[in-house]
C-alpha cells in the first residue's frame, strides 16, 4: 500500500459561503492544489491527496487503484531519469560552446554509429537494471518486501515510503511534501524537454542550446512558425 500524504490543515469556511460547514479532506486538497483546468471537475479517484495530483487524467487511465499505484511510481522514476537525461544532453553542449570542453554531439557522433559500450558490457548493464527494476516492481506490489538485502543479510532499509528509500539516496533530506511536489513538477517538465530536444534535433540537426542561441539572435524569424511553414 502506497502511503500518500494528505492535507490535514483546517480551512475556515468563507463568510459568504452557503451550505454545510463541513469540509472533507478532498475539499481541502482541491482548495490547496487546484485543478489542472479551471472549472473542470477532477475524477473521484484523484482527490488531491497524492503529491503532484491536480486531477489530470482525461483518458481515465488511473481509474483502477492498482494502475494508479503503478502510475504514481512511474511518474517519479521516469521524471528522475528525464532530469538526468536533459542534463546530460544540455550541459555538455553548453560547456563545449563556452570552450570549456570538447564533448561530442549527444545524439550523432562523427563517422559511423557508435555505442557507449561493447555488447558484453551492455548485456551486463541490461541484466543488472532488469534485476533492479524487478525489485522495484516487487516493492510497489508489496511495500517493504525488498527492504532486506537478499545477499548481505546484515544490510536492510528502514521502513520507508515506496519510491523514497532515504539514507544514502536522500543525503539532504529532501523528503517533505514541498520537495516532493517540486521533484514531480521538474520531472514532468524534463520529460517534455527531453521530447522537445529530440524533435528539435530531428528537424534541425542541432542541439537545444544552439537552437536557443539562433532564436535569441533573431527571435522574429527563428521560431516554430517559420519551421512549420518551411521558411
Swiss-Prot record:
Residue ranges of the TM segments: 183-199
Binding site residues for chlorophyll a 5: 182, 200
Protein keywords: Chlorophyll, Chloroplast, Chromophore, Magnesium, Membrane, Metal-binding, Phosphoprotein, Photosynthesis, Photosystem I, Photosystem II, Plastid, Thylakoid, Transit peptide, Transmembrane, Transmembrane helix
Organism classification: Eukaryota, Viridiplantae, Streptophyta, Embryophyta, Tracheophyta
Transit peptide (first-last residue): 1-31
Gene Ontology MF, one: chlorophyll binding
Name of the protein in question: Chlorophyll a-b binding protein 1B-20, chloroplastic
Binding annotation for chlorophyll b 2: 80
Family note: Belongs to the light-harvesting chlorophyll a/b-binding (LHC) protein family.
Binding site for chlorophyll b 1: 36
Record text on subunit structure and interactions: The LHC complex consists of chlorophyll a-b binding proteins.
Coiled-coil regions listed in the entry: none
Gene: LHC Ib-20
Residues annotated for chlorophyll a 6 binding in this entry: 215
Any one of the GO BP annotations: photosynthesis, light harvesting
Positions with a binding annotation for chlorophyll a 1: 56, 188
Region (Disordered): 1-25
Predominant localisation class: plastid
Residues the record lists as binding chlorophyll b 4: 136
Cross-referenced Gene3D superfamilies: Chlorophyll a/b binding protein domain
Note accompanying the cofactor annotation: Binds at least 14 chlorophylls (8 Chl-a and 6 Chl-b) and carotenoids such as lutein and neoxanthin.
Location within or outside the cell: Plastid, Chloroplast thylakoid membrane
GO cellular component: chloroplast thylakoid membrane; photosystem I; photosystem II
Function: The light-harvesting complex (LHC) functions as a light receptor, it captures and delivers excitation energy to photosystems with which it is closely associated.
PTM notes: Photoregulated by reversible phosphorylation of its threonine residues.
Induction: By light.
Chain positions recorded as chlorophyll b 3 binding sites: 118, 133
